Structure formats: structure tokens, C-alpha cells
Swiss-Prot record:
The active site is at 101 (tele-amp-histidine intermediate). Keywords: Hydrolase, Nucleotide-binding. It comes from Escherichia coli (strain K12). Residues 6-115 form the HIT domain. This is Purine nucleoside phosphoramidase. GO terms for cellular component: cytoplasm; cytosol. Its EC number is 3.9.1.-.
Length: 119
């Protein structure tokens, strides 16, 4: 089994966090280092280290992450103008916490997906 992460403690409310949504499958909270006016992390309540570790048993939680993202975008007033959902996987993908999570970013034009530094 994977090691517990800081996100596990947020789910259990053992450490302070600005939780904007929580149910039996997912938790969503504001990022402590926001990269946009709205920057919320949406995580499954079960520890799944990376996207590579996802299996069929996780489909309900992963689907809920998407529907919760849309609901939060509406509540935050960014749904109409648009927003970005990002999941990073492993070191080259930029993953820093090994508990899969989806970034919901919006509130301003976000620019290109990747910095153009060549292939």
C-alpha cells in the first residue's frame, strides 16, 4: 500500500484547509499556492498514488471528480468564461504529491498549455 500523504490528513480534517466540497468519494479544497484566481484541488478520498495506479474500481470516484469540478466552476462563477482541469502524473509530468489530484484553474485567461521550450 502507498504511503499516506498530506492530502489524507486534509480529507480527515486533521490539518487546516479551505475545503469547498466533500462527500464520501471526493474532497475539494483551495490550493495554498494558487496559480490562478480560482485554483482548487479535487482529490479522491481513497489514496491512489498516480494515474498509472487507477483501476476499474476507481471509476466512480474519478467520475465524481469531474462532476464536482463542473459544480465548483459554476459556484465560483468561472463556468461560462471557461476553466482548465489538469492532472499531473509522476516526475516528468510535474506531480509533487503522490495522491492523484485534479487542478481546477480559472478566473482569468490561462494562456498556452505548455511553455514552448522545444522538443
Amino acid at each position: 500500500m502507498a504511503e499516506e500523504t498530506i492530502f489524507s490528513k486534509i480529507i480527515r480534517r486533521e490539518i487546516p484547509s479551505d475545503i469547498v466540497y466533500q462527500d464520501d468519494l471526493v474532497t475539494a479544497f483551495r490550493d495554498i499556492s494558487p496559480q490562478a484566481p480560482t485554483h482548487i484541488l479535487i482529490i479522491p478520498n481513497i489514496l491512489i498514488p498516480t494515474v498509472n495506479d487507477v483501476s476499474a474500481e476507481h471509476e466512480q470516484a474519478l467520475g465524481r471528480m469531474i462532476t464536482v469540478a463542473a459544480k465548483i466552476a459554476e459556484q465560483e462563477g468561472i463556468a461560462e468564461d471557461g476553466y482548465r482541469l489538469i492532472m499531473n502524473t509522476n516526475r516528468h509530468g510535474g506531480q509533487e504529491v503522490y495522491h492523484i489530484h485534479m487542478h481546477l484553474l480559472g478566473g482569468r485567461p490561462l494562456g498556452p498549455m505548455l511553455a514552448h521550450k522545444g522538443l
